Amino acid sequence: MSAIVDVYAREVLDSRGNPTVEVEVYTEDGGFGRALVPSGASTGEYEAVELRDGDKSRYLGKGVLKAVENVNEIIAPAIIGFEVTDQVGIDKTLIELDGTENKSKLGANAILGVSLAVARAAADELDMPLYQYLGGFNAKTLPVPMMNILNGGAHADNNVDIQEFMIMPVGAKSFREALRMGAEIFHSLKAVLKEKGYNTAVGDEGGFAPNLKSNEEALQTIIEAIEKAGYKPGEEVMLAMDVASSELYNKEDGKYHLEGEGVVKTSEEMVAWYEELVSKYPIISIEDGLDENDWEGHKLLTERLGKKVQLVGDDLFVTNTKKLAEGIEKGVGNSILIKVNQIGTLTETFDAIEMAKRAGYTAVVSHRSGETEDSTIADIAVATNAGQIKTGAPSRTDRVAKYNQLLRIEDQLGDTAIYNGIKSFYNLKK
């Protein structure tokens, strides 16, 4: 195997027109890897820190020249000479170089860019697809897509409180068919919204962001779109929600303010509301149903719905094994959202997925609202046989890049490719 001979970072743009970090890694035998780093709009309190310059004269303070400099001046000299396949050793070095709990010294955006680019360079040098390099010969499960087709909350400028309403084509026989179903429902939803006189502009993640009257109207409209596309809600297609409750939570009164609906709810009332929605609609997954620090609320939600609904921790667990271990011990949630930039290295990302699986939790590999053309998460989803991916609507190139990569992977795998559909929810007792 050959050593790393050069590491270079530059400032580029993400899908929201904000700067982000791109890293290139070169090896002595001609291996090359490039990675771009995503960023979130609603971020968890305990996430690894994304380093921004704060210089208001450039990009409204959102520049990443400091993170780029950290790669070029500090990280590069430390990892040049490493065997490119020594992912664990390189990631360990990156963590030690930073020396902080939350990667605030060098920036998670600097560290992650390097970690991902190293893996890509190693795969390139071995002439292997990235998913196979990361996951070995058993990497063959295509994920069920969790497609965000209606947006509210921090991802949209409207009066819907719930941040994401998603569809999951669980009845498909292959990923290709699932993607087709999702795209057809997406177009069907556009037609339904037009008929109702609603706006059909899309939000950060490619979903529509109309000014609906209530959260329930969003669910009803999606059901209508599924049926109009010729599919059966609750059989072929399930619904999923990302509530992003930390954005609704008011620390002063300890309650949830659903401003779109003009109501204030306690944790218990939020749980009761979810129970009501689950009884009326085919909802199979709820993400961040309560605030990231409302462990008692999450425990109650898990007790009430944890056997029949996937309860995903995003802000709650922030792809962090310490937070996840606490959740497992307390019996909170039954699934973790995996965002590579929440933790900052590939090794730690894989550790979180492994810990989740050992505890019988599902793992959902996810994009961020600020994305790029980088499709690494598609390969990670297959490499880890995670079974689910959350990467937006089948619209906007930054989202579709991941879906197209999954189509390529399914093609490469041929007859060995697996699409588990509803069986991906292995910990639910339906």
Swiss-Prot record:
Annotated positions binding (2R)-2-phosphoglycerate: 163, 339, 368-369, 390
Subcellular location: Cytoplasm; Secreted; Cell surface
Gene Ontology biological process terms in this record: glycolytic process
Gene Ontology molecular function, alphabetical: magnesium ion binding; phosphopyruvate hydratase activity
One GO CC annotation: cell surface
Claim: Cytoplasm is one of the keywords in the record: yes
Gene3D superfamilies per UniProt: Enolase-like C-terminal domain (3.20.20.120), Enolase-like, N-terminal domain (3.30.390.10)
PROSITE patterns on file: ENOLASE
Pathway per the UniProt entry: Carbohydrate degradation; glycolysis; pyruvate from D-glyceraldehyde 3-phosphate: step 4/5
UniProt-listed SUPFAM superfamilies: Enolase C-terminal domain-like, Enolase N-terminal domain-like
Pfam family, one: Enolase_C
Enzyme Commission number, as recorded: 4.2.1.11
Catalytic residues identified in the record: 205, 339
Catalytic activity: (2R)-2-phosphoglycerate = phosphoenolpyruvate + H2O
Record flagged with keyword Membrane: no
UniProt binding sites for Mg(2+): 242, 287, 314
Protein role: Catalyzes the reversible conversion of 2-phosphoglycerate (2-PG) into phosphoenolpyruvate (PEP). It is essential for the degradation of carbohydrates via glycolysis.
NCBIfam families found in the cross-reference section: eno
Family affiliation: Belongs to the enolase family.
Protein name: Enolase
